[in-house]
Amino acid sequence: YKYTYIYGKPQFIYSCKLVPTDKTPAGKRDDISLREKEAQIKKDLDDGIDTVGGKMTVCQLYDKKNNQRKNIKRATEKGRQYLMNSLKNDPLGMRAIDTVKQSDAKEWAIRMSEKGYAYKTIDNYKRSLKASFYMAIQDDCIRKNPFDFKLSDVLEDDTEPKVILTPEQEERLLAFMETDKVYRKYYDEVVFLLETGLRISEFCGLTVADIDMQNRILNIDHQLLKDTEIGYYIETPKTKNGKRELPLTERAYQALQRILKNRGKAQPLIVGGYSNFLFLNREGLPKVAGNYVGMLRGLIKKYN
């Protein structure tokens, strides 16, 4: 059957059966008849459905969606790469989007879980794919969104809830650090982190210039991160509320005074226009989240 698409380009479809009552010839795969396919195409054309666009793969659709927004944070870019790589290594990635049903999307989620992906990661990926398929609906490529379902209906949320330390637990931990031969050198940094409530990347990004000791205020307008590919880099807050001035408590102020007094010599490093970072490792380079993750794990193990 030959038909002309809305842009004037001829398209062809084939079937080994003319009408539904015809038998499938020996050696041929069972398929709907040509007349049924013809009826589907006529309905799609009448409804303005892009039958050609519906043949793009899930990978192509996700790439098209990503190309709609280029100005993104590096963490978002890395997340996109991870999802694209997972799609390329999964049967779903090469499927035409007009063939993907909700059962296929649910089977994808189950496969992801079996591969060891965390529930939250799968949920984030599902949200991205749902947005991609929504774009395909808006572009009249498909009618329904196969990712329009609750992940909790398919997988059990096994995410362990974060447990916040009580004030009493904080004090006991700090008392232990203050007298421990190994961890007492981190005491002031942990006090400062707990008192300010900063994100660890904001904490690591603090520079001497961000500190107003006279008015006891911190200026928070950037984060310091480190990547295996590009090394240190600076990120700015996603929203205006991320930029703020933070007043120091008396305890934070006292800890900061000791930190400045005991601070080693910084290497002449400039990252994204920022230098003279407050928290340094033994080489005089800025500490990053990974340094504190390792330290805190060791501390907790010894404390417990």
Identify the meaning behind each predicted range:
Residues G205-G264:
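Conserved tyrosine-mediated DNA breakage-rejoining catalytic core shared by Y-recombinases
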Residues P25-D30, N66-C141, T159, K181-V182, ...:
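N-terminal core-binding DNA-recognition domain of tyrosine site-specific recombinases/integrases
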Residues Y125, Q138, I142-L206, Q214, ...:
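Basic, Lys/Arg- and aromatic-enriched nucleic-acid-binding interface segment
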Residues E36-A39, Y82-S86, E107, R127, ...:
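Generic recognition of well-ordered alpha-helical segments
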